[in-house]
Amino acid sequence: MLKMDIQKIFRELHIEEANEMQKQVGEVILHEKNDVVVLSPTGSGKTLAYLLPLVQMIDSSSEDVQALVVVPGRELALQSDQVLRSMRCGIRSASCYGGRTAMEEHRMLKDVKPQVVFGTPGRLNDHLGKENISRYGVRWLIIDEFDKCLQMGFQDEMQRLIQSLPGLRRRILLSATDAEEIPAFVSLAKAHTLSFLDNQEQTSDRVTLYEVKSPVKDKLEALRQLLLGFGDSSTIVFLNYRDSVERVDGFLKNNGFVTSCFHGGLEQKEREAALYRFSNGSANVLVSTDLASRGLDIPDIANIVHYHMPESEEGYVHRVGRTARWDAKGKAFFITGPEEHIPDYVKGNVESYVPSNEKKNVPVPRMATIYIGKGKKDKVSRGDIVGFLCKKGGLEAAEIGKIDVNDRYTYVAVSRAKMNLVLRQTQGEKIKGIKTVIEPVR
């Protein structure tokens, strides 16, 4: 078992210390033997709350999967897996979910030999049933967004999964709401419940609410003016329908904005690319359905824009929870048409906001994303990527941003001003002796 240097993990994550919720959860998980239920608002840092103690309990010398983290969707599986990898603590991990072949994941599990696996209930059951994951080595079961797992109808799959793990020692459930009763099949043993929910607080007091009135029913021009005033700060624009997302995203692109489009109708790889571009600063606007309102742990989102009003109070809380994460401050804007009003369930003071009519240039992100068609399975590391781009692409290390190395490909943020130069100079070049595809991600 590795002796964890928690301060080193904090440095890797670019944070100074755990927040109060994370400290309390960590103490209970590490020093008690009971099951644990954590109720904490969206954006409070629940992923790190369970990962920090978990990595201290994992036996890093074992090749068995020791912890399963059940999540309601692939986005949260990918995001949580990325958080653990970013900790660089020597614990191997993998994510499993629908949308790609189970055989591909089977090969990945054999190759990586993860100690922690993040996955959706159905796909985890599939791998347990085929013995791609040994059911006998799993000691810890974490169910993140437990409330959403129940709402999505995963009861039977979760029951099957829990009952198939004979060596299970601890169950850790995390939820942003206290609305759901925990079913008997979870078999919690003297659970220690930690609630950080303040029933009087619908949104963080670090979020300022604004109303932007559009004089016409079509709110595109009001949105354009609003975004111009944000400069290059990171913004999510929420809509209720996929076709509306496509329409608004197209309008913004036609007006020079650098955006990412995100909804459930896109192919898995398109969704991954959209999130990478947004999280690494290559696109400063994410236009999305409520798919982006839960499970995405992207820091430094300054603004939330409700182009369409949220369909429920719960949906509103999760949307606004994307900003003011950790100890940051954020802003949420409601764009209302002539016959629209802000929903009654929105509590707190909502200020009127009038975007400036002053002519401004469309903000362009400093970074752009390139795709490199090699990854971990090709023995390509972050260091290899940096060396290749500096030596062959003519970049300085400071002109390279976030690098996401996947199994078969890599996304890299590079200086937008140098992207065309990089593409020209690396054309036909080899990375670690292998020719590969290098192209922009738009």
Task: Give the location of each predicted region.
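Conserved pre-motif I regulatory segment
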Residues: 1-39
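Conserved nucleic-acid-binding Ia/Ib motif block in the N-terminal RecA-like helicase ATPase lobe
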Residues: 5, 63-129, 137-140, 250-262
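Walker A/P-loop NTP-binding motif
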Residues: 23-32, 47-62, 83-87
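Conserved helicase ATPase core of P-loop NTP-dependent helicases/translocases
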Residues: 104-108, 245-250, 258-289
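Post-DEXD/H (motif II) to motif III coupling segment of the RecA-like Helicase ATP-binding lobe
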Residues: 134-200, 346-347
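Conserved interdomain hinge at the start of the Helicase C-terminal
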Residues: 205-251
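Conserved segment of the helicase C-terminal RecA-like domain
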Residues: 285, 312-353
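A short beta-strand element within the Helicase C-terminal
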Residues: 294-309, 331-334
